[in-house]
Curated annotation (Swiss-Prot):
EC number, UniProt record: 2.6.1.80
Name of the protein described by the UniProt record: Nicotianamine aminotransferase B
Cofactors: pyridoxal 5'-phosphate
Tissue expression summary: Expressed in roots, but not in leaves.
Originating species: Hordeum vulgare (Barley)
Entry's induction text: By iron deficiency. Only a trace amount of expression is detected when sufficient iron is present.
GO biological process, one term: tyrosine catabolic process
Keyword Transferase: yes
Molecular functions (GO terms): L-tyrosine-2-oxoglutarate transaminase activity; nicotianamine aminotransferase activity; pyridoxal phosphate binding
UniProt cross-references to Pfam families, sorted A to Z: Aminotran_1_2 (PF00155)
Similarity annotation: Belongs to the class-I pyridoxal-phosphate-dependent aminotransferase family.
Disordered: region residues: 24-127
Record's compositionally biased regions (Basic and acidic residues): 86-96
Length: 551
């Protein structure tokens, strides 16, 4: 708990703390009295110890002349020995002059001896503790969430290792945003649809919490392709990207006391982070590298219990690049039914299939167990900054209506943010008019890059890729640390690689697999070849002395 000290007649009863006659100020617009008391937020005490209100400065004779004015100089400036503090106004958060007429910095008032101690509490001989009724997570779980379960946070940490003004450009192979490369520009039909929606002037308003009806209908029609029944607009909830879809679903499931959720390992860390913030217990099932990163179905029933509410599958898979077969997904649905749980199907990479295995929507099995599918424009249309996604309900038996899950999602969205109205308005035209040639071109680029990635990884004995990527934008790679000198783990590897080679990778630890890394191949082939070449050079420089470079 935080403690505020009180001494020498100095009272601390508000947001800020006043310093005593020895002249220390705590900084946030609060001045010290000579013998006096400060009553809170931005209040200066006069020379005789009187406080004159909110943000009101006293003159040298201890008189107050109004709201944020000192010695009647009209601009809120405090005077002492005939000097002013310029624009440092003594009016709440502003700055006042000290006893010698000199101005201090950053909203701090100096006292009789002119010393400032920032935001610290006043030093005192007598102490009085204040017990505050608020605090962060006592167990440290939430405090660690941002650092340990966030790709963004770990990417910033690793990027900080890059040498400033290095001889070579930084190659970001840590996250899936190829929009920075001109070759991955979105479809012209998508750009035109957004521009047209803006030009109408009709979509500058707030939308409905669950989304514009026309946009929801368009998504429902789009997602009904390939499933044995039609979705309606009521089956679709629009969100601010796939990330918000996760932020909506997890709290809804966490409303049941003692509930837990089954997550894949490796997996996308936002699920675990959101579960931690909502105190939803997480239990992991493994993906098997030697079986194309298939789900370890046999383990599902052993880790689930009566409090298990749902399981997450990611298909096509991030971070592994796998694409699941019809038979495999069917088995998952049957297990989910036996357990009485719903399936959350993260399908944001549904259009990005690179091999011969087709993408099978989990909604095909909605008649077996209820499915909440997460999708977005971000990946397939290469527009992550547009922030438009959805949650689609595949539930022909209306189980999620009966259990109030759909109602809870609606209620959550009614008190949450919305995707931009003009993007929603453009959505029907984007879905209808984007030509198949656009997707073929994007998939062609990704396929070429994935081939390069897999080939060059195979030529580097210090890393291992157990399965060629078949979809999404990523591949998981094992670090053969026993061949490397003074590399402690995957995070150490990534930080040193960034420092020496200006290549940014995602450590596997944040994805649930220590001593692995995730590489994105969603970039132009020449940059990818350069990056993989730098990785090999780094490994060769840091190899153990008795290790050869032969593959």
């Amino acid at each position: 708990m935080a403690t505020v000290r009180q001494s020498d007649g100095v009272a601390a009863n508000g947001l800020a703390v006043a310093a005593a006659a020895n002249g220390k100020s705590n900084g946030h617009g609060v001045a010290a009295a000579v013998n006096g008391k400060s009553n809170g937020h931005g209040v200066d005490a006069d020379a005789n110890g009187k406080s004159n209100g909110h943000g009101v400065a006293a003159d040298a004779n201890g008189k107050s002349n109004g709201h944020a004015e000192a010695t009647a100089n009209g601009h809120g400036e405090a005077t002492a020995n005939g000097k002013t503090n310029g624009h440092r106004e003594s009016n709440g958060h502003a700055e006042a002059a000290d006893a010698n007429g000199e101005s201090n910095e950053h909203a701090e008032d100096s006292a009789a001896n002119g010393e400032s101690n920032g935001h610290a509490a006043a030093a005192a001989e007598e102490e009085e503790a204040v017990e505050w009724n608020f605090a962060g997570a006592k167990d440290g779980v939430l405090a660690a969430t941002g650092a340990n379960m966030s790709i963004r946070a770990i990417r910033y940490k690793i990027s900080a290792s890059v040498q400033e003004k290095g001889p070579r450009p930084v190659l970001p192979l840590a996250h899936g945003d190829p929009s920075v490369f001109p070759a991955f520009r979105t479809a012209v039909e998508a750009e035109d649809a957004v521009a047209a929606a803006v030009r109408t002037g009709q979509f500058n308003c707030y939308p409905a919490g669950v989304g514009l009806p026309a946009a929801r209908s368009a998504v429902a029609e789009h997602l009904s392709q390939g499933v044995p029944y039609m979705l309606s607009a009521d089956d679709v909830f629009l969100t601010a990207g796939g990330t918000q879809a996760i932020e909506v679903i997890i709290p809804v499931l966490a409303q049941t006391a003692g509930a837990n959720i089954l997550l894949p390992r490796p997996g996308y860390p936002n699920y675990e982070a959101r579960a931690a913030f909502n105190r939803l217990e997480v239990r992991h099932f493994d993906l098997i590298p030697d079986k194309g990163w298939e789900i370890d179905i046999d383990s599902l029933e052993s880790i689930a219990d009566k409090n298990t509410t749902a399981m997450v599958i990611i298909n096509p898979n991030n971070p592994c690049g796998s694409v699941y077969s019809y038979d495999h997904l069917s088995k998952v649905a049957e297990v989910a039914k036996r357990l009485g749980i719903l399936v959350i199907a993260d399908e944001v990479y549904g259009k990005l299939v690179l091999g011969s295995a087709p993408f099978i929507p989990m909604g095909v099995f909605g008649h077996i167990t209820p499915v909440l599918s997460i999708g977005s424009l971000s990946k397939s249309w290469i527009v992550p900054g547009w922030r438009l996604g959805w949650v689609a309900v595949y539930d022909p038996r209306k189980i999620l209506q009966e259990t109030k899950i759909s109602t809870s999602i609606t209620n959550y969205l009614n008190v949450s943010t919305d995707p931009a109205t003009f993007i929603q308005a453009a959505l029907p035209q984007i879905l209808e008019n984007t030509k198949e040639d656009f997707f073929k071109a994007i998939i062609g680029l990704l396929k070429e890059s994935s081939e390069i990635c897999y080939k060059q990884i195979k030529e580097n004995k210090y890393i291992t890729c157990p399965h060629k990527p078949e979809g999404s934008m990523f591949v998981m790679v094992k670090l053969n640390l026993h061949l490397l000198e003074e590399i402690d783990d995957d995070i150490d590897f990534c930080c040193k690689l960034a420092k020496e080679e200006s290549v940014i990778l995602c450590p596997g630890s944040v994805l649930g697999m220590a001593n692995w890394v995730r590489i994105t191949f969603a970039c132009v082939p020449s940059s990818l070849q350069d990056g993989l070449g730098r990785i090999k050079s780094f490994c060769q420089r840091n190899k153990k002395r008795n290790s050869s470079d032969d593959c």
